[in-house]
């Protein structure tokens, strides 16, 4: 693309600047090829002429569009170059306070030098399980990606953290390890993750120090491998260390410190255990005072010492070993204070009894003289002899320092080995994630051996990094099948060869170290001779012969040769080491030096796999022939090279992830960005190299759909095809002519660097042109509108002026016209009056004359008409008379003629009738004649009828005309009379008119007078009325004001009291909720510890019961004992479950619940305290009313109960006495009155009497119960029964009892029983049975009517609901209802069948009993009675009907069937089948009915065992299927129902208010199960928490996709295209959830809970928790995703929330508190949509966002990103204003909401109206071994 197309007017470029590195400027005119100068304008408004380089003609780099500024990924920038990268990092760091940014596969982390709240556990949970491209850049995102790729690809991972000292490498590595420890639990050993984290404070204390650049700088490199098992849980870790900076032990530069551990020891010197170390202030010791900065601001070394010791203890370092470590460290400090005195130039000595050396020897346990001798001497060995040589003071000091460094290095390695042993696991490692905390590229004014090794390591790492980046780039191209060429990138291999190849720098250094007289100078000369002018990367400084320069990938570095050989050899005298090894009092010291040679050997690595790199070879005193070890000759450089090769092999075998830490400034100022320092580090850490590699290929990638959506504005309508891919191709070919600038892949379009910016420029130009056109149109419209407004104003003025003139002229014309009209009307009146008189006279004459003529004419016409009528009638009469006469004559003639003809014919017929043939012929003719005659008769009849009708019509017409003529005559006569009267009337009226005119004139005169007086009176009256109204209004106003004041005061007082009461109530509720939450958290913690205890116990059993030969046994991991309960929410439990299920279970002894109950005492006290608080609150609210209600309600109920109990007790006692007396008297009477043979036992009469007596006794018991029930009802329902009836009933009962007693006293009981009583009893029993059957039938009919009514209501409701549903939902609802109806009918039929079966079985059983009794009776009679006696005394058997006993709502089972009951009812029960086919809560009812029977039997052991087994069974089911929502919901519902049953039937008054009398009879009588209710309540809380976890696990994957990512409102894009975001995840989305998915899941949850019969209040709490999870997860992701913070996304979120609110309304759950949990999300969405410019906007935001914390508000404003370039970003000054306004707000500094928070749950008492005695046990449950009682 030509430069002239890009470098146009308004284009922005970057130009170099000495201060800011790069400055932004804008072109003032287009660039043309050949121009030497660019006309620019800087951002501050200064114009500048920028001269181009005449040689290269290189133009300044272009600036990216504003829409790309602040991107999460640097490679998403269209122009990829240094200034763009620097500017993007600066904007994110300074403006948005974002310290993390992606650069391809690299995470760039800038040290903020400030504590940020972005590393808490809530942030870890937010990033856990998320795709890397979905969240904002973070170290946790990199760690999650590594963890996910390890689990998915089953490949080891590495996280390489590098950067300068002080850039934050150690902190980043520490947070990465913390993330792994948090998201994955330990597999076998306890607290493995805690041990991994505990290694950090130990390694920081012994390996970190304060430098000029960093207060906590790591002075060694480390690679930590975190091991995972097959389930990807942490099982251990392993650490490798690299190149410890030992020189810091003996020397520190200005403003630096030694290692932290020394200062921690000095700060803790006052501790009693440290007295023996004889430490003091750090300034006392030579090794800690050289830097002059012993204290770090904000760091307490004493506290850090405590943390270090705690970490050592956690890692298994015993107190004795810890004290040994501290003794060695203290000895090093004292050794540094040892001073030497010179004897001469070649010898020195230590003063006798030198205190520092004495302390050192005491601490080390070595001989003072021996150590003092070898510090001042050394042993030399030749081929023939060995001799001791004194050394100078300088050499002695160097030897002392070398010894101190060697001791510290060995101690460091020992601690590392011990840490590795503590982190080592016996479980086989499946995979690992390595975290490499390595030093970055370093260059100082003086660079020595340490910087050389560091830069060498960075060259190797950079080479590996370049290859990995290149590989990923090419894989993407190959995947999309686009042609690509080899990308040229910087190759580090030449530099690496210069360092490590044969005859390289390290090789020559090692060779020089082997030379007896080798020196730094000779080594430098060898380097010059070998590489100078032969290797382009090697140079020699101009002014030095003791230095060399290497061109590294980042920069040129000049190394000083001085000290290279000494540091490479790192020699320490062996005699000093032998003295330390000889220590007998100190066990740790010899351990540091034992097997030193073995430790150095690469073939004898430590068990942890660590490669020790800082071991120092010990120089032997004498080289023995044949035993010279090559391992002792290995130098530090050689060891480092080998370890680096091992490290690279490890990294190459893993998938690397890169973190580059940047130090923003050298002064540690928070959020201060130094461009110069940042550019240096960006060049050194490879970020710019990544940019260069990306820029060489196709850095910008767009999907076809995104490209089409973004650049649709550049297309014409004819270019848009149905095939989006082809459309994009056609458009690109027109927009970008150079086809090399883009490539078409399978799913994406790849662009070269700068092409997206070019397209954005074209798009912006197009939109700018459109905007200009819109502006032109709008401005024209505004000017037109202004002109029209002015024109309308002018016209209005003209109209008013002309109107005034016209009105004046109109007034003149009106007056003139009025005068003319008055004249006209006056003249017209006179003329009209004269004319009217003449006209009236003429009309009157004409009327009279015309009337006279008309009357004459009328009379003549009337006479003529009457004459014609008379003539007509006369003529008609004459014609009729003549006709009748003629007709009569004709008929007579015809009759005569016919008579004659008939006679003749008769004669013929008589003759013919005598022959048969004639008769036949006649017969045939007669038939035809008869038919013809009949036809003629019919015709004549018809004709007669028609003539008759005509005659009638003529008569009617005649009569009508006659009446009409009569009326006409009458009317004419009347008209004549009226005309005469009118003439007379005219004359009289004329006279009256004249008279009235006079009266009218008088009346008009009077009227004027009256009107004048009335107007005056009216005016006065109106004035008076207005004055009265004003006074009345004032009085009303005053009255209203006073009333308003009184009302306001009353209202204010009321509101104050209500507000105070509400505040107190809220405070009490908060305290109650806090206490409840604290208790439930403790319960949750107890469950977790219990789970942990069970797991450890199972593991211990598993370890103990190792299979032996010939005997195979596997312990169960599922225990059936006690109250074990676990929540399987992690991947580890889910994967462990199949393994546990396969193992056989082993029965254990049941838990004694008394132990668990003792643990609940504290819980009971807390509940009582909460109850007292609640009671106090209730008393404050409704004290008077509630007290009065209680006084009215309690006495009658309590009195009725007491009366019933006392009556029952008295009746029982009296009946017992009566029955005893009766039996005695009866036996006595029988003995006295009957013969011995009759009354002997076994006799028939005796048996009959005894049977009758038994029957009567039973009947009396029945009567007694009826009387007691009646009496209790009379006492408790006095208002329903009249006193008189009460008295009669009681009297009747008393009389009945008195009669019975009299009969007993008289001795007539036998005859009464045999006679009358028997008859009465039979009649009463028959009557009772009939009455009962009638009542049952009536009750059944009522039940059927009620059920039919309910069914009708349900059908009507269903019909109403169906009419509101769409057709598909209507069909589905109808089917569901039909299924429910059929199921209920099926259940009813099953119940009826069961009842009938039971009745049949009962009848059969009674038949068998009766048959058996009859058989026994017959046998007894045959044995005891002779035949004669049988004949003489026949005994008639008496049929005694028994009353069938009602069910008592209990279930009986045997003790040995308890486990079977738990197994069938709990363990193997399928919730779905029970919930669909049976009544809700059936298992709970069954269990309670079993408890009732055990209580009825007074068997405490049975009650305890059943309840314990039930609780354990429920826990076992939830442990086995705890991740199934239906199972958890089912048992939560049943547990609550079981708890409610225990309360409802406990017998406590508070729970019996809603019971029926029958239900009160079912209350428990022998046991108080209040403690078990507490246990069940705790169990319900645990199940509820498990239910919440299951809900969370199901909803979690849906929330972000459905609430944030899915575009619910079509046409409104809430996020940028991925082409602008660039960063994508390594894992493709498996499925996209929408808001409908969430709502469908909510519907599923709600329907399942309703189906299980869960309490409505509990459902509301579950829904509230679900909505809290949705709101918290959505808000947390919003706060961590910059791409989601836009205006359109806020609108999408608000719409989604409204849909959730609509769901709440549909389910009638708006009062559940769920909507309030969404308030933070709603306010966040509103914050994205409101204006964010002025102070008024800031005030509105502060008042609106009261549910968001200050941190959240500021975070949203910082993250706000416009979706397109026409939106404005939030200014930094506006954010500062918000912070100032919210400064006084007291809220949590926490950024994210706690998505794991669970609201405290309560279980309000919900009694059941279901009668226990009506519950049937379905056969499908397999509970045939229990029976109803």
Swiss-Prot record:
IQ domain ranges (all copies): 767-789, 790-814, 815-837, 838-862, 863-887, 888-915
GO BP term (any one): actin filament organization
Tissue expr: Neuronal and non-neuronal cells of the brain.
Domain (Myosin N-terminal SH3-like) ranges: 8-60
Coiled coil region boundaries: 916-1239, 1315-1419
Alphabetical UniProt keywords: Actin-binding, ATP-binding, Calmodulin-binding, Coiled coil, Golgi apparatus, Membrane, Motor protein, Myosin, Nucleotide-binding, Phosphoprotein, Repeat
Phosphothreonine PTM positions: 1734
Reaction equation(s) it catalyzes: ATP + H2O = ADP + phosphate + H(+)
UniProt-recorded Gene Ontology molecular function terms: actin filament binding; ATP binding; ATP hydrolysis activity; calmodulin binding; microfilament motor activity; minus-end directed microfilament motor activity
Annotated segments matching region Actin-binding: 644-666
Taxonomy, superkingdom: Eukaryota
Transmembrane spans: none
Keyword presence, Phosphoprotein: yes
Assembly behavior: May be a homodimer, which associates with multiple calmodulin or myosin light chains.
Family: Belongs to the TRAFAC class myosin-kinesin ATPase superfamily. Myosin family.
The name this protein goes by in its record: Unconventional myosin-Va
Native source organism of the sequence: Gallus gallus
């Amino acid at each position: 693309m030509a430069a002239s197309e890009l470098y146009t007017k308004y284009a922005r470029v970057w130009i170099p600047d000495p201060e800011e590195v790069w400055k932004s400027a804008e072109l003032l005119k287009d660039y043309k090829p050949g121009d030497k100068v660019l006309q620019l304008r800087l951002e501050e408004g200064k114009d500048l002429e920028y001269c181009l380089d005449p040689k290269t003609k290189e133009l300044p780099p272009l600036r990216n569009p504003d829409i790309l500024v602040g991107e999460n990924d640097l490679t998403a920038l269209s122009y990829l170059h240094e200034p763009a990268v620097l500017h993007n990092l600066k904007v994110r760091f300074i403006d948005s306070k974002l310290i993390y940014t992606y650069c391809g596969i690299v995470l760039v982390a800038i040290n903020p030098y400030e504590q940020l709240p972005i590393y808490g556990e809530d942030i870890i949970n937010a990033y856990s399980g998320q795709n890397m491209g979905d969240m904002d850049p973070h170290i946790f995102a990199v760690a999650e990606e590594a963890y996910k790729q390890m689990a998915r690809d089953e490949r080891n991972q590495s996280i390489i953290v590098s950067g300068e000292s002080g850039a934050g490498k150690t902190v980043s590595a520490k947070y990465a390890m913390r993330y792994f420890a948090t998201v994955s639990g330990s597999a076998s050993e306890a607290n493995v993750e805690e041990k991994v984290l505990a290694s950090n404070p130990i390694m920081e204390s012994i390996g970190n120090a304060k430098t000029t650049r960093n207060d906590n700088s790591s002075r060694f490199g480390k690679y930590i491998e975190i091991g995972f098992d097959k389930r990807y849980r942490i099982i251990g870790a392993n650490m490798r260390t690299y190149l410890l900076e030992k020189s810091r032990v003996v020397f520190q530069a200005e403003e630096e410190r030694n290692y932290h551990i020394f200062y921690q020891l000095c700060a803790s010197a006052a501790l009693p255990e440290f007295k023996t170390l004889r430490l003091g202030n750090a300034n006392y010791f030579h090794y800690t005072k050289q830097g002059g900065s012993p204290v770090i601001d904000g760091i307490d070394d004493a506290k850090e010492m405590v943390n270090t010791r705690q970490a050592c203890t956690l890692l298994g370092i015993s107190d004795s070993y810890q004290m040994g470590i501290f003794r060695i460290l203290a000895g090093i400090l004292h050794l540094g204070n040892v001073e030497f005195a010179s004897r001469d130039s070649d010898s020195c000595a230590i003063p006798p009894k030198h205190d520092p050396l004495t302390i050192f020897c005491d601490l080390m346990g070595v001989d003072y003289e021996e150590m003092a001798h070898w510090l001042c001497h050394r042993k030399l060995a030749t081929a023939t002899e060995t001799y001791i040589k004194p050394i100078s003071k300088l050499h002695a000091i160097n030897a002392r320092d070398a010894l101190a460094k060697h001791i510290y290095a060995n101690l460091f390695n020992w601690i590392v080995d011990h840490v590795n042993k503590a982190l080592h696991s016996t479980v086989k490692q499946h995979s690992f994630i390595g975290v490499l905390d390595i030093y970055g590229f370093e260059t100082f004014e003086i660079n020595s051996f340490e910087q050389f090794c560091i830069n060498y390591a960075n060259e190797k790492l950079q080479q590996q990094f370049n290859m990995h980046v290149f590989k990923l780039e090419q894989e993407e191209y190959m995947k999309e099948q686009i042609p690509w060429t080899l990308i040229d990138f910087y190759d580090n291999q030449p530099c690496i060869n210069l360092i490590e190849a044969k005859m390289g720098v390290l090789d020559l250094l090692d060779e020089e170290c082997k030379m007896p007289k080798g020196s730094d100078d000779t080594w430098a000369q060898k380097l010059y001779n070998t590489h100078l002018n032969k290797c382009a990367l090697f140079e020699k400084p101009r002014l030095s012969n003791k230095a060399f320069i290497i061109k590294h990938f980042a920069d040129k570095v000049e190394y000083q040769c001085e000290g290279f050989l000494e540091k490479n050899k790192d020699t320490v005298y062996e005699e000093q080491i032998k003295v330390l090894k000889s220590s007998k009092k100190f066990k740790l010291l010899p351990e540091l030096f034992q097997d030193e040679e073995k430790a150095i050997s690469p073939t004898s690595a430590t068990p942890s796999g660590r490669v020790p790199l800082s071991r120092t070879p010990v120089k032997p005193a004498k080289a023995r022939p044949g035993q010279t070890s090559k391992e002792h000759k290995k130098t530090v450089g050689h060891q480092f090279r080998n370890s680096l090769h091992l490290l690279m092999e490890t990294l190459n075998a893993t998938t690397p992830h890169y973190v580059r830490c940047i130090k923003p400034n050298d002064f540690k100022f928070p959020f201060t960005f130094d461009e110069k320092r940042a550019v240096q580090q960006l060049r050194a850490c490879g970020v710019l190299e990544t940019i260069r590699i990306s820029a060489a290929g196709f850095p910008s990638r767009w999907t076809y759909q995104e490209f089409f959506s973004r650049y649709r504005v550049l297309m014409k309508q004819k270019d848009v095809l149905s095939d989006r891919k082809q459309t994009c191709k056609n458009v690109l070919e027109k927009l970008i002519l150079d086809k090399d600038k883009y490539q078409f892949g399978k799913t994406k379009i790849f662009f070269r660097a700068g092409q997206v910016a070019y397209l954005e420029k074209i798009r912006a130009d197009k939109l700018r042109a459109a905007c200009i056109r819109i502006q032109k149109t709008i401005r024209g419209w505004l000017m037109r509108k202004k002109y029209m407004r002015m024109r309308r104003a002018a016209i209005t003025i003209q109209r008013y002026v002309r109107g005034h003139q016209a009105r004046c002229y109109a007034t003149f014309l009106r007056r003139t016209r009025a005068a003319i009209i008055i004249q006209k009307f006056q003249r017209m009146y006179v003329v009209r009056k004269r004319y009217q008189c003449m006209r009236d006279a003429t009309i009157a004459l004409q009327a009279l004359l015309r009337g006279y003529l008309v009357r004459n004419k009328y009379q003549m016409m009337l006479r003529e008409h009457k004459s014609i009528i008379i003539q007509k009638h006369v003529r008609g009469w004459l014609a009729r008379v003549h006709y009748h006469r003629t007709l009569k004559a004709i008929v007579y003639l015809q009759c005569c003629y016919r008579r004659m003809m008939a006679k003749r014919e008769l004669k013929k017929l008589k003759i013919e009738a005598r022959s048969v043939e004639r008769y036949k012929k006649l017969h045939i003719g007669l038939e035809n004649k008869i038919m013809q005659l009949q036809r003629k008769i019919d015709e004549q009849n018809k004709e007669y009828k028609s003539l008759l009708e005509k005659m009638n019509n003529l008569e009617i017409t005649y009569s009508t005309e006659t009446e009409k003529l009569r009326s006409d005559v009458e009317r004419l006569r009347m008209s004549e009379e009226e005309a005469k009267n009118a003439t007379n009337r005219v004359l009289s009226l004329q006279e009256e008119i004249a008279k009235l005119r006079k009266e009218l004139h008088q009346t008009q005169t009077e009227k004027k007078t009256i009107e004048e007086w009335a107007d005056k009176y009216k005016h006065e009256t109106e004035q008076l009325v207005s004055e009265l109204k004003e006074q009345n209004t004032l009085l009303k106003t005053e009255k209203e004001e006073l009333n308003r004041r009184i009302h306001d005061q009353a209202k204010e007082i009321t509101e104050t009291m209500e507000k105070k009461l509400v505040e107190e109530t809220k405070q009490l509720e908060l305290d109650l909720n806090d206490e409840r939450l604290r208790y439930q958290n403790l319960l949750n913690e107890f469950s977790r510890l219990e789970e942990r205890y069970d797991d450890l116990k199972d593991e211990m059993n598993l370890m103990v019961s190792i299979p032996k030969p010939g005997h195979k046994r596997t312990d169960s991991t599922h225990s059936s004992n006690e109250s074990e309960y676990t929540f399987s929410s992690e991947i580890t439990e889910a994967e462990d479950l199949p393994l546990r299920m396969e193992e056989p279970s082993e029965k254990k002894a049941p838990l004694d619940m008394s132990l668990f109950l003792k643990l609940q005492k504290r819980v009971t006290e807390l509940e009582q305290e909460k109850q007292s608080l609640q009671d106090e609150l209730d008393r404050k609210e409704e004290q008077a009313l509630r007290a009065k209600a209680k006084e009215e309600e309690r006495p009658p109920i309590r009195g009725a109960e007491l009366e019933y109990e006392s009556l029952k007790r008295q009746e029982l006692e009296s009946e017992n006495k009566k029955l005893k007396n009766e039996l005695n008297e009866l036996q006595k009477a029988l003995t006295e009155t009957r013969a011995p043979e009759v009354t002997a036992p076994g006799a028939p009469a005796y048996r009959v009497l005894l049977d009758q007596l038994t029957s009567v006794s039973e009947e009396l018991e029945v009567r007694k119960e009826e009387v007691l029930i009646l009496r209790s009802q009379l006492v408790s329902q006095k208002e329903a029964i009249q006193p008189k009836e009460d008295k009669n009933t009681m009297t009747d009962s008393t009389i009945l009892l008195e009669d019975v007693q009299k009969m007993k006293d008289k001795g007539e009981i036998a005859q009464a029983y045999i006679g009358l009583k028997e008859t009465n009893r039979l009649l009463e029993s028959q009557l009772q049975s009939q009455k009962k059957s009638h009542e049952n039938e009536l009750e059944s009919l009522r039940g059927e009517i009620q059920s039919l009514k309910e069914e009708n209501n349900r059908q009507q409701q269903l019909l109403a609901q169906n009419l509101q549903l769409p057709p598909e939902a209507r069909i589905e609802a109808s089917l569901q209802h039909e299924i429910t109806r059929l199921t209920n009918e099926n259940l009813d039929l099953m119940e009826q069948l069961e009842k009938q079966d039971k009745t049949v079985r009962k009848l059969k059983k009674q038949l068998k009993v009766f048959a058996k009794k009859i058989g026994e009776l017959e046998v007894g009679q045959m044995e005891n009675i002779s035949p004669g006696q049988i004949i003489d005394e026949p005994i008639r058997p008496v049929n005694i009907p028994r009353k069938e006993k009602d069910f008592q709502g209990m279930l009986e089972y045997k003790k040995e069937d308890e486990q079977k009951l738990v197994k069938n009812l709990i363990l193997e029960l399928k919730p779905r089948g029970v919930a669909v086919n049976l009544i809700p809560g059936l298992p709970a009812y069954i269990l309670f009915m079993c408890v009732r029977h055990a209580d009825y039997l007074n068997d405490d052991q049975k009650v305890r065992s059943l309840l314990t087994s039930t609780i354990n069974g429920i826990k076992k089911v939830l442990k086995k299927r705890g991740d199934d929502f239906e199972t958890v919901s089912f048992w939560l519902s049943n547990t609550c129902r079981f708890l409610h049953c225990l309360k409802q039937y406990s017998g406590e008054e508070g729970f019996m208010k809603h019971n029926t009398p029958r239900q009160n009879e079912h209350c428990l009588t022998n046991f108080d199960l209040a403690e078990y209710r507490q246990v069940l309540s705790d169990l319900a809380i645990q199940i509820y928490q498990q239910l919440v976890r299951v809900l969370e696990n199901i909803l979690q994957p849906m929330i972000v996709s459905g609430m944030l990512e899915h575009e619910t409102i079509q046409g409104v894009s809430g996020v940028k295209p991925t082409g602008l975001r660039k960063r994508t995840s390594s894992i493709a989305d498996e499925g996209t959830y929408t808001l409908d998915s969430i709502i469908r899941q909510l519907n599923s949850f709600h329907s399942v809970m309703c189906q299980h019969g869960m309490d409505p209040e509990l459902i509301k709490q579950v829904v509230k928790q679900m909505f809290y999870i949705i709101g918290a997860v959505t808000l947390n992701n919003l706060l961590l995703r910059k791409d989601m913070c836009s205006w359109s996304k806020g609108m999408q979120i608000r719409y989604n929330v409204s849909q959730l609110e609509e769901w709440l309304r549909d389910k009638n759950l708006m009062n559940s508190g769920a909507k309030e949990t969404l308030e933070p999300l709603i306010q966040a969405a509103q914050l994205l949509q409101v204006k964010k410019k002025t102070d008024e906007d800031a005030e509105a935001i502060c008042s609106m966002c009261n549910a968001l914390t200050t941190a959240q508000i500021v975070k949203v404003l910082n993250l706000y990103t416009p979706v397109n370039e026409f939106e404005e970003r939030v200014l930094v000054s506006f954010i500062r204003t918000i912070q100032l306004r919210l400064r006084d707000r007291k809220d949590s500094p926490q950024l994210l909401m706690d998505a794991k928070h669970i609201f405290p749950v309560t279980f309000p008492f919900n009694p059941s109206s279901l009668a226990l005695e009506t519950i049937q046990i379905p056969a499908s449950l397999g509970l045939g071994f229990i029976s109803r009682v």
